[in-house]
UniProtKB/Swiss-Prot annotation:
The keyword Metal-binding does not apply. Its main location: secreted. The lineage of its organism: Eukaryota, Metazoa, Ecdysozoa, Arthropoda, Myriapoda. Belongs to the scolopendra toxin 5 family. This is Scolopendra 5924.74 Da toxin. Keywords: Neurotoxin, Secreted, Toxin. It is found in: Secreted. It comes from Scolopendra viridicornis nigra (Brazilian giant centipede). Disulfide bonds: none annotated. GO terms for cellular component: extracellular region.
Length: 18
């Protein structure tokens, strides 16, 4: 989710910490 932010925008928030 960290390296695929663009690929997975749904987990982007979760990976970022909220």
């Amino acid at each position: 989710a960290q390296t695929v932010r663009x690929d997975i925008p749904h987990h982007e928030x979760y990976a970022a910490g909220g």
